[in-house]
């Protein structure tokens, strides 16, 4: 631990240094998202070869996919404690180390049971990253760029997906699924190196009573010393509330409202159904008439590129367009896309589809993913990091992140079962209905938080304002 004295805390910094530090923090922490994206993408391409190698049933295929989410849900339960004890920085370090171990274990698995166990370890690592990185970024960013910095995390997720799809396509010619899974260890090592140079979160430092260090970090990140001191004072005011976590959740209705809203948001994100496209894209395109592995992987890569470019656009629009408009438009686009995709797949099931419907299926999949990438994918993480009161932020985000992974596990573990029971059309139309419902929930319940400080949101929440008004 580096001790920063008062003199260093008063050292002036140039605007260029401030911008460089903000960029470094954003990119370094967002590498955690890259790891998440790599694991999402790599299993889509590796699963057909793993299925052939171990002769897997549909149920075991679902477990190979969803075991990562199971581990993430388990890891999320301990994230609050880990983040409070070690801080955001060293929580990221722990996640990166586990990611290396899980990747190597997956690559050298000699049985499906060993593979599932290794993917549970990967899941714990991903769960730590998905909790800690958005939280860290929200606490490091000023209110006018907070959405952009957290969206950088989602952009890195999509970049990871695209890189995984590219890697899968390259290795698909030889069917080397072990190389597909083992290559994930490389960016995890990069994250370990980058985390060494990251500063601790000023809010975590203040919570530990290390106010001089907290001010020094804020001075590294804010345009002026006055802004740094003003923000530190706001943090101190927020910390005057003594109770925290579970104790505060039990006795304070407003805290419960924030926690339940975060859980609802994460469930909504997952039950859009978009991650089943990421996990099972080759299978979906096989149902859509693409018969060869090469055709399926190329179509999958196109979807990944769509995800990445749409997320890139979202990075520069989320702080301008606002959270609520993005969600309402995104859910509407996903509802339309899944509706038409279900129709296309029904024609293939009936044997009445033309070749043009194959490409329409790809187009609808791209539309769904673009809608997701520009709305629920980044915005839900942004909102969940913004709405929790500081004194119980670890607890609140632990609850919402756990909900994300449990919901993620459910959709991953039920997709093939749904296909067998209600068909491809019924499966995607189920997600159409859910997305329509989410438009209404967004309109009536979700707050707009753009360009608002975390402390302002907390004051409105604790004053008992309606949830949709806490950002006003």
Swiss-Prot record:
InterPro entries assigned to the protein according to its UniProt record, in alphabetical order: MFS_dom, MFS_sugar_transport-like, MFS_trans_sf, Myo-inositol_Transporter, Sugar/inositol_transpt, Sugar_transporter_CS
Keyword Transmembrane attributed: yes
Subcellular location(s) of the protein: Cell inner membrane
Regulation: Symport activity is inhibited in the presence of the uncoupling agents carbonyl cyanide m-chlorophenylhydrazone (CCCP) and tetrachlorosalicylanilide and 2,4-dinitrophenol. Activity is partially inhibited by N-ethylmaleimide.
Induction note: Induced by arabinose. Transcription is dependent on the transcription factor AraC, the cAMP receptor protein (CRP) and cAMP.
GO CC, alphabetical: membrane; plasma membrane
Pfam families named in the record: Sugar_tr
Superkingdom assignment: Bacteria
Molecular function as annotated in GO: fucose transmembrane transporter activity; L-arabinose transmembrane transporter activity; symporter activity
GO biological process terms held by the UniProt record: fucose transmembrane transport; L-arabinose transmembrane transport; transmembrane transport
Entry's transmembrane regions: 30-50, 64-84, 92-112, 115-135, 155-175, 179-199, 258-278, 298-318, 326-346, 362-382, 405-425, 426-446
Reactions mediated catalytically: L-arabinose(in) + H(+)(in) = L-arabinose(out) + H(+)(out); D-fucose(in) + H(+)(in) = D-fucose(out) + H(+)(out)
Lipid bilayer topology: Multi-pass membrane protein
Keyword Protein biosynthesis listed: no
Keywords tagged on the record: Cell inner membrane, Cell membrane, Membrane, Sugar transport, Symport, Transmembrane, Transmembrane helix, Transport
Cytoplasmic side: 1-29, 85-91, 136-154, 200-257, 319-325, 383-404, 447-472
Regions of this protein lying in the Periplasmic compartment: 51-63, 113-114, 176-178, 279-297, 347-361
Function, in words: Uptake of L-arabinose across the cytoplasmic membrane with the concomitant transport of protons into the cell (symport system). D-fucose, a nonmetabolizable analog of L-arabinose, is also a good substrate.
Protein family membership: Belongs to the major facilitator superfamily. Sugar transporter (TC 2.A.1.1) family.
Protein name as annotated: Arabinose-proton symporter
Record organism: Escherichia coli (strain K12)
